[in-house]
Amino acid sequence: DPDSIPMIGLSNKQPFSVMMFFMCSYPTQPCQVGFSPAAFSSTPMGAGVKRRASEEEESDQPPKKLFPDGKLFKSNFVLLMDKTGAKIPCPEQPMHF
């Protein structure tokens, strides 16, 4: 049940933040966060996060676009890393999408 998977301490009302977080950390190197990779055994991590985000976009209130300029910097993730208690490397350059 995907709804039972803890999304690094964020509620499912913030799928955009979660998706951006994984876009930053996951493709570069293994992601060490506060939950076991076994939680994603039935589904690839990236696909699962994107699927949850697309489901949320269909809701009555669309998710807030946190970065309207389309750029993402390491400093945007300080709070997320602190909430999980994990140190997750992130590329310094902005990510375009």
Swiss-Prot record:
Physiological role: Accessory subunit of the DNA polymerase that acts to increase the processivity of polymerization.
Organism field: Equine herpesvirus 1 (strain Kentucky D) (EHV-1)
GO biological processes: DNA replication
Keyword DNA-binding: yes
Protein family according to the UniProt entry: Belongs to the herpesviridae polymerase accessory protein family.
Domain of life: Viruses
Molecular function in Gene Ontology: DNA binding
Name recorded for this polypeptide: DNA polymerase processivity factor
Keywords: DNA replication, DNA-binding
Keyword DNA-binding: yes
Residue ranges, annotated region (Disordered): 42-68
